[in-house]
Amino acid sequence: MSESKNRALFLDRDGVINIDSGYIWRPEDFLFNDGVFDACRAAREMGYLLVVVTNQAGIGRGLYSEQDFHALTDWMLAQFRAEEIEIERVYFSPTHPEEGIGIYRRESPDRKPGPGMLLKARDAFNIDMSRSVIVGDRETDIQAGINGGVATRILVEGEEDDPASSQADVVVGSLAEAVAWLSERENA
């Protein structure tokens, strides 16, 4: 008998979990979006593993270090744990193909729209991509989902992209709305 596969809710960080106010690397600059904890709790109750997939070009551009990113990530995960919410893992891509410095100036399959982070999570957590969802605030997140075979793609409307031209399955205003949409769809 084969082991059953998990389904995941892949979350972009900046713009989905927190307010995207530019390159964020300090806890004092990190503001959670309204409803994030309740939405993540509801998604866990629906059986989704929570996996964060985030481009962090600020590292590649020399604006902050990988150590700064990890310190902020540890702080963020502690906030989730305080709310009794488990995030399976945070994957990040520090590269930028044009504006990266040194080792960070390169193409990477991990940098969205590449599917590398999604595929690493798939392999690490036995994830069935055909039952999984990605939520992002940019079309590059949606494209990463397509490239990684993620069945459902949800765009949180932001300032960057035109929702009318998105390849997302649905466009919503927040992660809370995304999880509510998933819940309604599953209970239909």
Show where each model-derived region lies.
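Active-site neighborhood of HAD-like aspartate-dependent phosphohydrolases
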Residues: 2-51
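Short, small-residue-rich loop/turn micro-motifs
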Residues: 13-15, 19, 94-96, 157
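Ser/Thr/Pro/Gly-rich low-complexity disordered regions
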Residues: 45-48, 91, 171
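Short, solvent-exposed loop/turn segments at secondary-structure junctions
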Residues: 25, 58-63, 100, 142
